[in-house]
Each structure stands twice: as C-alpha cells, then as structure tokens.
Amino acid sequence: MTDGVPARGSLRSRGAAAVSAYTLRPITSVIPPERAWGLWLSRQIIARIMGTFGPSLAGTRVEPVDTRLPDGRRVKGEWVYGPRTPTSETERSSTTVGAIYYVHGSGYAVCSPKTHRRLTSWLSSLTGLPVFCVDYRLAPRHRFPTAADDVRAGWDWLVTACGVPPKQIVIAGDSAGGHLSVDLLLQPGIEHPAAQVLFSPLYDLTFALSLARERIRPDPATSAANAVRLVGLYHSGVELTHQRLTLDVAGGPPLPPTLIQAGGAEMLQEDARQLAADIQTAGGRCELQVWPHQVHVFQALPRMTPEAAKAMAYVARFIAHALQDARALAEEAR
C-alpha cells in the first residue's frame, strides 16, 4: 500500500457501491453472456454506465487508425488527445516526448476504445501525452489468442511505424486489458516500456481468487460465476494452463516499474495483490494501491466517485517520474 490512499471511501462512493449491489449485480447475474441477446445487452449496459458516469473530457480530439503492418497484420484503434495535448497536426510531433499505449478492458467481449474515452482522454490531459488505444477484436467471434495478437500488432505498429522508442512509452490497461498488457510484456522480443499502469487487472482467469474474495464480501457489480462465463467466451476450447492464459509472472523476466490500482469493494483486488507479489518475486518494482470501498475500475467513473480524480492524479505523477527516469538512464548509457 502507498501514501495518498484514504483510509475510508467517500460517502458518495460507498453509496454508489451499495446502489450497484442492489441494482447492477442482480441484473448481470441473470444475463446469459453465451446468448447473442445477452451479450448485446451486456454491451449496452456497460456502454451506458461508462458514458453516463465517465464521459470523455470536453475538447478531446480523436484520430481513428486502421492500417496494416508490412507483414499484413491489421492495426485498429484511435489516437486520443486530451485538451491542450499536441496532436499529429501540430508543428511539434505529438509523440516526441512519449506516448501511452492503452489496452482497454472488456472481459475480452464487451467494450471498445469508445467506452474508455474518459480514461484515455484523462490520461492524455493529465500527462500531456497522446494515447493510442488499440481496438482489438472481441469474443466470441474472435477467440484466444486473437485479442493478444492484436495487442502485439498495436505495439509493433507504435514502435516501428510511429517510431516511438519503447522507453518513451507507458503501457496501461484495465481489467482484461491488464492481463493482455502483462501477456505482451512476457512475449519474446519485446523491449519493455518505461513503465506499466494497471487498473483493476484481471490476472487469474480461473477466478479462484475472486471466488475467495466473494466469500468474504460480494462484488457490487457482478459475481465470479458470471465473470467465468463471460471470459470463457474468449478462451473456450483452450486449457487455462496455457502459458498465455495463466501467466508466469513470478518465473519470468522482471517487468518494468508498475503501478497497480484496485478497488477495495471489487473481487479482482485479490488478482491485483497476487500480480503485485509475483512482479516483486521476479525482481520487478511494483506499487500497489487498494482504494477502500471503490468498485471495479473506479477511475473511469468520476461522476460516481470523487476518489477517481485523486487516483488519476497519482497515476499522472507516476508516469511523469517513470519517463523522467527512463530518459535519465538513456542519457547515462550514451
């Protein structure tokens, strides 16, 4: 745990979690993600919640990307520029000082760069950096390892086609996007970025950790059983023991400096704790923050919880320091 995290959640955030427990959780528990109408409804509900409680910042500019790498791999996504962040059309190259590569959450099946524009526009505005959010293909139409391969393609495009040095990039992701981000950094041939930021990362795809937490206190938004069904749309037909599903972080190379934030009311807080411990076991530096009484990816819902602004301000400082440290190391190596 780090300084700056309050000992208790605000009255508004605690109230929002309580309301969610009596409204959203009962709804998500009966929607069948395996059915086409159930998945469609889940996507609509999540998009409405994120649009209502976490709208994009006014003045945000978005540039769609749909291109291919020389080897034929397709890259889709969007550049997001928060208010006052230089764009590709300005005289100063927008990626001169660095960029953020964002991998959105989704349970691999329900979200998109559009649903996450509050997070990406906020990250851009607070850091002054452009954010590239990859639009990876979703399950069940596209199963494992499609999303992971799309995330790799997006990274390769950012580094090669856009010419952004890895040490000037910070990778960030939430929920399933956290799992995809870590998977990327464990792949051979990947030069690590300056840092990694994870919001409520999914780490244990068996959801055993979530189930253990659920026995102590239920998540106000969903259940472990429902999450298993949703994520199963992605890895169906593949054993969870696969090395790109059950990630061997503890036995792998040290990951770049990492900040993990999770909510104290969510079941994935146990994933956050385990991932942080495994990063440290492998020799990496990891800062873990569990914010009391906060829901899953609360940073994306500032109209619901005032703690979102405090958490994001901390993230911006972490990113600034990480890029500064990376530049200093590069200067020393010359």
Model regions and ranges:
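A glycine/proline-hinged amphipathic helix-loop "lid/cap" segment
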Residues: 1-92, 324-334
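Alpha/beta-hydrolase superfamily serine-hydrolase fold, recognizing
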Residues: 72-334
